[in-house]
Structures are given as C-alpha cells and as structure tokens.
Amino acid sequence: MKETSAKKLLLKNAKIYDGSAAPAFTGDVLVEGDRILEVAPSIAADDDFEVTDLHGLSLAPGFIDAHSHNDWFALRKDSGKYFAPFIKQGITTFVSGNCGLSATGFAD
C-alpha cells in the first residue's frame, strides 16, 4: 500500500446513500487520498482537516454503468476525454462485454 501525504478531507452534513438499500442518513465522511476512513453521524474535525459542509447535498458511492459500449474508447490514446463526462456524472465503473464481445479483453 502506498503512503499518502494528502490532507484529510471531512465532508460534513451530507445526506448519505451508502449503497446498501438502507434509508439515507445525514452524516459525515472522512477521506484521505483515495480512501474513505470513516462514515458516521458526526465526526469531530481536527485542525489539519479540510472541511466542506455538504448541507442540502447528497453523497453516494460511484455508480456502475451495467450497459455501455465505452470499452471501445479504452483502446484510444486520448481515452480520458471520453470517460471524463461519465466521472462527472458519478459513474466510476463500466461493465464491458455485456453484448457478448469486448474490444478490451478480459483477465483470468
């Protein structure tokens, strides 16, 4: 696991959908680098935390696009420009090969 010196980000007062089908709840999320460290109804902020108040906003895990043909873009050298709009919409994962074939292949 790589070491990170990223400042901890505390997201406060968000309406949190955790992906479990449980009802949303208002709470806080503590993030460091690319890791979620804690999710709780309330997390006390340390002096070194960057704090963002999300009151009135919702927070959810990344969405999975289960039917997409974006695997064809993955082969392009400039693929980032094709995937960036999906990331802005909250889509972090694509299922490829869902029509019986894929441009990118599969790992064992």
What do these predicted ranges mean?
Residues K2-L9, I16-G62:
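Histidine-rich, glycine-flanked metal-binding segment
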Residues G27, A74-R76, C99:
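Hydrophobic alpha-helical membrane-insertion segments
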Residues D78-D108:
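Divalent-metal coordination cores built from histidine and acidic residues
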Residues L57-Y82:
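Di-metal (Zn2+ and/or Mg2+/Mn2+) metal-binding site signature of metallo-dependent hydrolases
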Residues R35, I43, S68-N70, N98-G100:
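Short glycine-rich, polar/acidic loop-and-turn segments at beta strand-coil junctions
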Residues D46, W72-A74, S102-F106:
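Short active-site-adjacent helix-start/loop capping segments
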